[in-house]
């Protein structure tokens, strides 16, 4: 049963995520209908009656005892509108009362002639009804002491000032009449509610959503509240008063909270980029994983509330609220599976689309052409999420702005026409209206008003008109009038019978169109995949197969169809295609199949001038290149086919360099994506150079296993690293620490005098200079952020070292652009117009060269990796011992490197691993110069006897976007490590992790090689020790073992054949390494 519920809820959530628009629009429409249906139930009657009314009329009969005296308030009776034209009322004395109220923004309010003062800012004007129109015209504008007061409509923004003040008064009155314990209880409940609401936004920020996920979470609960209120009021007839709602909802929110929704959103956000599954499955799994816990929590609370409703059925207010709360929880549960799941599905789509766009922007900032960057980003998204049917092809900040503006516009529009406040009670009269009350546009008849009205002989009918509000004329009044005018016109247009129908029709058409396009996009992707599968499984046509022909020289050639690599759900497969022309075929086959006469060079030149080079054959284009009419670098542009350009270039260079080897396949060129190479990685391409790629591992790095790819032609390197991985894993794996992250660029500038150069240095080193340049630098990139500027002065030349974070890119192009702009900004805006820029790179970086500044200050990622190797593992796996390793490391890596004057070379062979991993993962192999800076340290644990080994590498320069990482094989190796592309939530984390992997691989290789060297030395010493014991006449006995442990010193090694064999194996490994 439980598994059935989990499957059902997961299926519902998947359906919602697959059809997000339907499952978002329908609940929103239902919630809107519910809102419109119940809003009238909570509008106070006195406000209802005053809305749009022309006034309220009262009648007082004639009594001789009250003639020309104070009337009796109890004898005033309200007149129904149906009877206002009865004779008794038409013959009575007709008087109109105009209430006036002045908003106190000034010390003195104007005195209206013939008006009676009620309070400091309240007056009433009593006039005969037949003079009312003239009086109202005179009241439109009043001038007093140079200040113009304008009559205002209270249905504008100013009414909310009254609502807030009245609400505060009501709260204050309620507090004064409540028990202290009740006040404390309600206060704690409200604190809990606001804590839960704020926590939603805080938790959603942690998973990368600043506003919309939290807002959607609250919207889902709000919809549940409205739907529950509709069912409770209209169907169950258990209306809950506003007082009960205001006191009970905080308790409900505090008890239930939003933890399940936040947890589901967290799982979806984490899986949106890490999981290759499509969006509906990601959302469905997240929801089904919380099905049982969410059902349990909600059902327990619902059961408790219903029990309370049954037990306390005589307490109507409590019973109704318990029923409403149960309905809220039920609808909330349903909306989690529908509305909220649909929102999560859209959010995942947007995140994946945004990540693709961010990758494209980062590649463009790295200097890669926009076309290549767009293709790489799109293909990367396809590879990461092969099952994804993504219909978000672009994402722009304007979309977010549009959503914010629409949301604010909705609330603003509603605020102007809300016309009520839920803070009011639903009863008329009482103490609140004992005086002249302006919270309703039409106040009730009060004692203050009745005392000013004389009673006629036939009675008196007094009509109290809506209150006229006055405000001093100013900018805010004019702005309010403008906003009110615009919204009123818009509202009038919406209310129009014809326009409203068109709007409804357009809304329905928009929904249908969106659904149609989303389904069409999904169908197109599905149809494409089916077509690919069909092409793969179709039998090969005989006309496409290779044909073997024999030429006059007896050589054999085969014309084969090209193989194009296509990515699909199951990986990369090869699909045979029929060549459109003879470009892919050999010359010999062309002669036999379609002997075509090659145009002379002059004719080819004419075609070149006409811009129709692509119509020529490969041989004809090649003749243009050989004849010097077409540059080698222009082939891609002229032919508009990168692969064909490679073929033609090979033909041309084979003739120019007299290198027939390029006419063969010894240097391969086929089956390669040259679109990623052109404009990004290489120029004048003639093929690609295959390198064998091995894998070392798994190596546990920070409690996570990694298989490390290594491209190398050096034998035993991968095997040696594997042995180091095994030993490290036996001790628990590698621990890594990132101590610094910042790429550098060090331009050189020059000044006319030393004084100016020194002043510039001091200014750059100051806080003002650092802040100014940082602001200019950061404006050039979305990713690069300047950390620090270091300067050095040599004569009149000033060297400036910029250190910058560059996200997941290695960042050289990104930082160079920022440096250029910063220097230009210094010249043009900061008063250093006499500064001359010698070079953007002044070797103060330092890039691709040995330099102590990189060793000391660091460059790129500074990583320290350490591991503990148990003593028995050193013996059994590494075939050595701890003391020998420690002694060897001191003598070789520390003392030996120091004697050689090395800078950053205190290691055995760090460059081996750095270069191998760099080649496999698309890094710049030239940067192994500074990236291989490493010091290897080993020491023996005094308590356990284990080996503690570490490598410190202060200048590892890597990136996971840009450069060679855009090539598919190298990108695949980054995928193997799980660090391809930009990190979805923490920019720079992927590149940092790659640097940690590089350092950990170096640690494994260092450990293995040093163990082999130490074992070889031990064998040599041991053999010498054995020979010294053998009797040899006339021979000089020498017993000087270079490295011995406690066993060797007492001769026990000689008697232990196993140790001898172990050391011999270690020496063999040493020789191979």
UniProtKB/Swiss-Prot annotation:
Residues 542-565, 1030-1042 have a biased composition (Low complexity). Pfam families: HMG-CoA_red, HPIH, Sterol-sensing. Induction: Expression is not affected by lovastatin or fluconazole. Keywords: Endoplasmic reticulum, Lipid biosynthesis, Lipid metabolism, Membrane, NADP, Oxidoreductase, Steroid biosynthesis, Transmembrane, Transmembrane helix. CoA binds at residues 720-726, 877-879, 1021-1022. SUPFAM superfamilies: NAD-binding domain of HMG-CoA reductase, Substrate-binding domain of HMG-CoA reductase. Signal peptide: none annotated. GO terms for molecular function: hydroxymethylglutaryl-CoA reductase (NADPH) activity. Residues 579-589 have a biased composition (Acidic residues). It catalyses: (R)-mevalonate + 2 NADP(+) + CoA = (3S)-3-hydroxy-3-methylglutaryl-CoA + 2 NADPH + 2 H(+). Residues 1046-1055 have a biased composition (Polar residues). The active site is at 714 (charge relay system), 848 (charge relay system), 924 (charge relay system), 1022 (proton donor). It is found in: Endoplasmic reticulum membrane. It comes from the Eukaryota. Residues 542-589, 1025-1056 are annotated as: Disordered. InterPro entries: HMG-CoA_N_dom (IPR025583), HMG_CoA_Rdtase (IPR002202), HMG_CoA_Rdtase_cat_sf (IPR023074), HMG_CoA_Rdtase_CS (IPR023076), HMG_CoA_Rdtase_eu_arc (IPR004554), HMG_CoA_Rdtase_N (IPR023282), HMG_CoA_Rdtase_NAD(P)-bd_sf (IPR009023), HMG_CoA_Rdtase_sub-bd_dom_sf (IPR009029). It is an enzyme of class 1 (oxidoreductase). Coiled coil: none annotated. The keyword Transmembrane helix applies. Residues 182-346 form the SSD domain. HMG-CoA reductase; part of the first module of ergosterol biosynthesis pathway that includes the early steps of the pathway, conserved across all eukaryotes, and which results in the formation of mevalonate from acetyl-coenzyme A (acetyl-CoA). HMG1 catalyzes the reduction of hydroxymethylglutaryl-CoA (HMG-CoA) to mevalonate. The first module starts with the action of the cytosolic acetyl-CoA acetyltransferase ERG10 that catalyzes the formation of acetoacetyl-CoA. The hydroxymethylglutaryl-CoA synthase ERG13 then condenses acetyl-CoA with acetoacetyl-CoA to form HMG-CoA. This is 3-hydroxy-3-methylglutaryl-coenzyme A reductase 1.
């Amino acid at each position: 049963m439980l598994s059935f519920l989990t499957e059902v809820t997961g299926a519902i959530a998947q359906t919602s995520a697959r059809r997000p628009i339907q499952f978002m629009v329908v609940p929103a429409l239902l919630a809107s209908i519910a809102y419109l249906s119940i809003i009238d139930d909570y509008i106070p009657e006195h406000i209802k009656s005053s809305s749009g009314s022309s006034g309220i009329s009262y009648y007082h009969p004639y009594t001789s005892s009250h003639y020309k005296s104070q009337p009796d308030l109890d004898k005033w009776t309200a007149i129904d509108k149906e009877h206002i034209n009865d004779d008794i009322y038409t013959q009575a004395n007709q008087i109109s009362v105009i209430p006036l109220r002045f908003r106190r923004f000034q010390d003195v309010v104007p005195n209206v002639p013939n008006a009676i003062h009620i309070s400091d800012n309240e007056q009433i004007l009593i006039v005969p009804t037949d003079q009312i129109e003239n009086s109202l015209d005179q009241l439109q504008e009043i001038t007093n002491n140079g200040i113009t007061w304008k009559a205002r409509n209270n249905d504008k923004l100013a009414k909310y000032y009254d609502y807030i003040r009245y609400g505060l008064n009501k709260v204050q009155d309620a507090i004064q009449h409540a028990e202290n314990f009740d006040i404390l209880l309600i206060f704690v409940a409200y604190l809990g509610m606001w804590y839960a609401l704020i926590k939603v936004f805080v938790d959603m920020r942690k998973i990368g959503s600043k506003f919309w996920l939290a807002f959607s979470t609250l919207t889902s609960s709000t919809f549940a509240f409205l739907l529950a209120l509709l069912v409770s009021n209209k169907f169950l007839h258990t209306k809950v008063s506003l007082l009960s709602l205001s006191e009970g909802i905080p308790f409900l929110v505090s008890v239930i909270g939003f933890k399940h929704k936040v947890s589901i959103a967290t799982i979806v956000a984490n899986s949106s980029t890490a999981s290759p599954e499509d969006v509906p499955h990601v959302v469905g799994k997240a929801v089904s994983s919380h099905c049982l816990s969410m059902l349990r929590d909600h059902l327990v609370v619902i059961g408790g509330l219903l029990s309370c409703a049954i037990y306390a059925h005589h307490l109507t207010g409590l019973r109704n609220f318990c029923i409403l709360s149960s309905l809220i929880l039920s609808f909330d549960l349903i909306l989690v599976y529908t509305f909220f799941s649909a929102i999560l599905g859209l959010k995942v789509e947007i995140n994946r689309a945004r990540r693709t766009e961010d990758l494209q922007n980062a590649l463009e900032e790295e200097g890669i052409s926009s076309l290549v960057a767009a293709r790489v980003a799109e293909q990367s998204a396809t590879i990461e999420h092969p099952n994804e049917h993504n219909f978000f092809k672009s994402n722009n900040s304007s979309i977010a702005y549009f959503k914010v503006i629409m949301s604010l516009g909705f609330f603003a529009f509603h605020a102007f026409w809300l016309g009520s406040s839920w803070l009011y009670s639903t009863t008329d009269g009482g103490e609140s209206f004992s005086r002249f009350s302006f919270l309703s546009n039409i106040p009730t008849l009060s004692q203050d008003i009745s005392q000013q009205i004389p009673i006629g002989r036939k009675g008196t009918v007094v009509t109290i008109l809506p209150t006229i509000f006055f405000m001093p004329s100013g900018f805010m009044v004019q702005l309010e009038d403008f906003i009110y005018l615009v919204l009123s016109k818009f509202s009038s247009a919406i209310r129009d019978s014809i326009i409203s129908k068109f709007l409804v029709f357009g809304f329905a058409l928009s929904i249908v169109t969106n659904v149609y396009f989303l389904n069409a996009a999904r169908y197109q992707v599905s149809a494409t995949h089916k077509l690919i599968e069909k092409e793969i499984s179709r039998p090969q046509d005989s006309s496409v197969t290779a044909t073997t022909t024999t030429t006059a020289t007896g050589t054999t050639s085969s014309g084969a169809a090209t193989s194009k690599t296509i990515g699909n759900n199951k990986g990369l497969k090869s699909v045979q295609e029929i060549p459109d022309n003879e470009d892919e075929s050999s010359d010999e086959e062309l002669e036999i199949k379609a002997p075509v006469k090659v145009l002379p060079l002059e004719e080819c030149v004419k075609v070149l001038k006409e811009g129709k080079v692509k119509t020529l054959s490969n041989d004809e284009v090649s003749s243009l290149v050989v004849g010097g009419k077409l540059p080698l670098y222009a082939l891609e542009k002229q032919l508009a086919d990168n692969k064909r350009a490679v073929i033609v270039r090979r033909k041309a260079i084979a003739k120019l360099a007299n290198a027939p080897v390029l006419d063969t396949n010894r240097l391969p060129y086929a089956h390669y994506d040259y679109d990623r190479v052109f404009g990004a990685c290489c120029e004048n391409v003639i093929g690609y150079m295959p390198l064998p790629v091995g894998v070392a591992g798994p190596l546990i790095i920070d409690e996570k296993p990694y298989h490390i790819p290594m491209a190398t032609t050096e034998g035993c390197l991968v095997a040696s690293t594997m042995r180091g991985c095994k030993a490290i894993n036996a001790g628990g794996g590698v621990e890594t620490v990132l101590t610094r992250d910042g790429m550098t660029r060090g331009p050189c500038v020059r000044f006319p005098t030393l004084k100016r150069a020194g002043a510039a240095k001091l200014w750059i080193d100051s806080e003002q200079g650092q802040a100014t340049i940082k602001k200019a630098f950061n404006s050039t990139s979305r990713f690069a952020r300047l950390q620090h500027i270091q300067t050095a002065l040599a004569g009149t030349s000033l060297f400036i070292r910029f250190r910058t974070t560059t996200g997941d890119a290695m960042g050289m192009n990104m930082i160079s652009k920022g440096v250029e702009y910063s220097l230009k900004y210094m010249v043009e805006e900061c008063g250093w117009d006499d500064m001359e820029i010698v070079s953007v790179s002044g070797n103060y970086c330092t890039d691709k060269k040995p330099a102590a500044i990189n060793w000391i200050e660091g460059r790129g990622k500074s990583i320290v990796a350490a591991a503990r190797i148990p003593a028995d593992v050193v013996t059994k796996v590494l075939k050595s011992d701890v003391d020998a390793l420690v002694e060897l490391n001191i003598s070789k890596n520390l003392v030996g490197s120091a004697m050689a004057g090395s800078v950053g070379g205190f290691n055995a062979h760090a460059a081996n691993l750095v270069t191998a991993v760099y080649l496999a993962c698309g890094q710049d192999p030239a940067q192994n110069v500074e990236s291989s800076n490493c010091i290897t340290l080993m020491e023996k644990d005094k308590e356990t006897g284990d080996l503690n080994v570490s490598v410190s590498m202060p200048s590892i320069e890597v990136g996971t976007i840009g450069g060679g990482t855009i090539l598919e094989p190298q990108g695949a190796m980054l995928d193997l490590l799980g660090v391809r592309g930009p990190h979805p939530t923490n920019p720079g984390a992927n590149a940092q992790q790659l640097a940690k992997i590089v350092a950990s691989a170096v640690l494994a290789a260092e450990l293995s090689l040093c163990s082999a060297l130490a074992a070889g030395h031990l064998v040599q010493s041991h053999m010498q020790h054995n020979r010294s014991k053998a009797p040899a006449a006339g021979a000089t006995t020498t017993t000087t073992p270079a490295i011995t442990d406690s066993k060797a010193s007492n001769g026990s090694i000689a008697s232990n054949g196993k140790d001898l064999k172990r050391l011999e194996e270690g020496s063999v490994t040493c020789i191979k390494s």
